[in-house]
Amino acid sequence: MRAVVQRVSRAEVRVDGAVTGAVGRGLLVLLGVARDDGAQDARLLADKLAALRIFEDAAGKMNLAVAEVGGAVLVVSQFTLLGDARKGNRPGFSDAAPPEAANALYEAVCGMLREKGLRVETGVFRADMQVELVNDGPVTILLDSRRLF
């Protein structure tokens, strides 16, 4: 499971012009599910997202997690994070999980974040979405449940 995590001052996702999810201060998480991911990957990623200290404390040091700043999380599914462009110029997506399995794990991550008391907004799985954000910092972190980076 891969995630691009961005600290945002605001973010929203639209489908057919309608806002399906929006947050103010918080995290925008672009989430890709791999073919061999399972419940353990979802748990690891949810735990890491909730605990990730990328918000500044009073001293200006990145020392606070999203809940500690009253932030929310916008999670958007993005299978293209599993794209492989090592050969040729068109990425292949064979490492991405099939839609049914990917959706189940995407929903699991969102549910686990909610269980931790976080407000979670989402996009629409498999929809053509437009994501708008203001990256605060900018701060962007790459996470991988297999710790590849």
Curated annotation (Swiss-Prot):
Keywords: Cytoplasm, Hydrolase, RNA-binding, tRNA-binding. The keyword Hydrolase applies. Its EC number is 3.1.1.96. It is found in: Cytoplasm. One of its GO terms (molecular function) is tRNA binding. It is an enzyme of class 3 (hydrolase). GO terms for biological process: D-amino acid catabolic process. InterPro entries: Daa-tRNA_deacyls_DTD, DTD-like_sf. GO terms for cellular component: cytoplasm. Its main location: cytoplasm. A motif (Gly-cisPro motif, important for rejection of L-amino acids) lies at residues 137-138. Pfam families: Tyr_Deacylase (PF02580). An aminoacyl-tRNA editing enzyme that deacylates mischarged D-aminoacyl-tRNAs. Also deacylates mischarged glycyl-tRNA(Ala), protecting cells against glycine mischarging by AlaRS. Acts via tRNA-based rather than protein-based catalysis; rejects L-amino acids rather than detecting D-amino acids in the active site. By recycling D-aminoacyl-tRNA to D-amino acids and free tRNA molecules, this enzyme counteracts the toxicity associated with the formation of D-aminoacyl-tRNA entities in vivo and helps enforce protein L-homochirality. Belongs to the DTD family. A Gly-cisPro motif from one monomer fits into the active site of the other monomer to allow specific chiral rejection of L-amino acids. Homodimer. This is D-aminoacyl-tRNA deacylase. It comes from Anaeromyxobacter dehalogenans (strain 2CP-C). The lineage of its organism: Bacteria, Pseudomonadati, Myxococcota, Myxococcia, Myxococcales. The gene is dtd.
